[in-house]
Amino acid sequence: MSIEAETVKSTEKFALMVDLGIITVPDDYDHATRLTTFLERNRKKFYDVHNDITDKNFPSPSRILKPGDKLCVRAFEQVVGGTTTSEERMAFLETQGAVYTGAQGASILWDQRHDQLPKNKWYCSFDKKERLFKDADGIHRVPRIDIYYGGDFCFYLDLFERAWDVDSIILCFSDLSEPSEA
């Protein structure tokens, strides 16, 4: 199948679930320590946090954020039955002009919009496979924020190589700022 056909096929599988508006990277943002400071400040607000969500394991997402950056954030859901692949989801994100902000982007979204995320969903912050953390088993891991019906949150890692279902939501960050070098 051609790339164009795969892109068309991918766009038919996903639809906007919620537009989360614009988030702004805080003035005190430091990329090198973002995840450490975020978890120091918020760990008790999460039911669970994966131990591998660290600045060391996620040092270089495709889009390195800087203070003052503005990002439009939308969440897309799968609207077809069955499963989709990470490659299909990434192809869809490309059609949306997404930038990949990694665990850092997900943490800023949680700080600024967690109260607007529909419950009982898993919000995944995709990136190019080579930019993702690779665990001890050689598996690439995708950062995600889980929100359960009761309101509990988890900051977790999923498997890039897995089959995704309708509960796994795609976070789409669109850059409204001048790009920085990654």
List where the protein language model places each region.
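A binding-site-centric feature that preferentially detects glycan-recognition modules on secreted/surface proteins
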Residues: 1-99, 105-182
